[in-house]
Amino acid sequence: MSDQKKYLVTGANRGLGLEFTKQILNGNHIVYAACRNIDDIDELQLLSKKYQENLIVVKLDINNHDSIVDLNDHLEDVAIDVMINNAGTIGPLPYFENTYKQHFGTIDYDVWSDVFKTNLFGPVKMAETFLEQIKKGHDKKMIFISSVVGSIADDHQKAFAYATSKT
């Protein structure tokens, strides 16, 4: 199919990433579904039965620059039309019991560092590393998932590290 596009979706095994993957596959496109934990891909395995030719599950730890480079090497000959940087974290779970670690006065800098590593530095490294494959694609798009929680006007969630990393 000449208008079949190739997508790279991070955090593809659950949440928004899984839904993006489903919607893209429904459009008869190819998805490289990147996820950190290859053992936690039950829903992707179900999808792969229906979309055998179009769904390729690949390992990626967005926090690990070597993992990003390894994936780039693995997909070296793939012209990527659209990369969706979706992988992210809100911080330690259980979320509501741990938001104080993101508050001024009780900041846990390791939490902030982990959140920024996943939500900011990882996606920037993805963009830098996959730029050439995206330039080879037809659409040439990079999409970065933000959040309304990143809005200064809407600070009711109190996940300040997450909000700052998603602004």
Model-flagged regions — what are they?
Residues 6-9, 83-84:
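Conserved hydrophobic beta-strands of the Rossmann-like cofactor-binding core
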Residues 8, 12, 160:
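NAD(P)H cofactor-binding loop motif with strongest signal on the N-terminal glycine-rich segment
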Residues 13, 17-22:
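N-terminal Rossmann NAD(P)H-binding glycine-rich loop of SDR-like oxidoreductase domains
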Residues 27-42:
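Conserved glycine-rich Rossmann-like NAD(P)H-binding loop of the short-chain dehydrogenase/reductase
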Residues 58-70:
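The beta1-alpha1 cofactor-binding region of Rossmann-like NAD(H)/NADP(H)-dependent oxidoreductases
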Residues 89-116, 124, 135-167:
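Catalytic loop of short-chain dehydrogenase/reductase
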